[in-house]
Amino acid sequence: MNHQARMRWRCRRGMLELDIVLQRFIDNHYEQLDEHQLELFEMLLSLSDHDLWNIIIGNTKEPNNQFQPVLKLLQEN
């Protein structure tokens, strides 16, 4: 299984909303991500569904803005 396929699998979550946003992100942006953005995306995927969703929709601010390069793309989806 290649890296993109593994990431696509990790994007399958317990929330339909997250599944939709994350799958669209993979479809639309994965190929253009640089190494740093890929690392940030993997770190985001390690968060709980609830925490990740709240960060994406802006209900929770991330503490140090480290995810902004990827969050901006996620929020476009």
From Swiss-Prot:
GO BP? succinate metabolic process
Give its localization: Cytoplasm
User: Pfam families annotated for this entry?
Assistant: Sdh5
A GO CC term assigned to this protein in UniProt? cytoplasm
Task: Give the source's domain of life in one word.
Answer: Bacteria
Q: Which family does the similarity line name? A: Belongs to the SdhE FAD assembly factor family.
Please state what the protein is called: FAD assembly factor SdhE
Organism for this UniProt entry: Nitrosomonas europaea (strain ATCC 19718 / CIP 103999 / KCTC 2705 / NBRC 14298)
Q: Which gene encodes it?
A: sdhE
